[in-house]
Amino acid sequence: IPQPLPAGYVQFKELLNTVPLPSHSMFNITNCHYCTNANNIKNCYLVRGASYTEDSAYLIWDQSSKQCLDSHMTNRCELSYGNVNTTTCYRTFFSVDCESCHEIVLCKDSVGCNNCFGSVGLRNKSYYIFNKSYTKEEYQKKVEDFNLGSNQSFQEIKEQAYKHWLDYPNKFIHGYHNTDVSGDYIYNSKNTKNSFRVNGVEDSKFIQNILT
């Protein structure tokens, strides 16, 4: 049975519904358009929830990336496109949950990798395609044969990569250094329930996008 909200919460709700909200929250921005909830960004377009981002567009929740497009939850990435939850990656494309990688395409849950394509769960690997190892020359020839300059060819190989991803289990949770938590993308937190994309949080429930 739902419990009534404490009086303090009711008062806060009334106040929140009465006081006008700002149209956007930004400071120290240079040459940016249609951005919000951002600080210390430069030459950006349609970027939301960003800090120290430069020369980028269509990002949500980014920190300290440069020349990135169409990505979500990126941190210190450069010259990358179409990614979700990537950290310190360079020339990374259409990849998810990757860290410290460069020159990878359509990879998932990979760390410390370079020149990999369509692979999942790799650690410190080079020249892998769909989780199979190749020589440098074989890798370059096979990727060239994919004809990624053609949108039709790329869409076909992307569908193949997504099906390959399904052959590997998803992580129960993305995070580390946690105690008694539930949700996803939780780091350095304790006693935190049903929360998402948080760092350094304790004794909390139902929160998101809190990075201390």
What is each PLM-predicted segment?
Residues 1-212:
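Long, distal/terminal scaffolding or interaction modules
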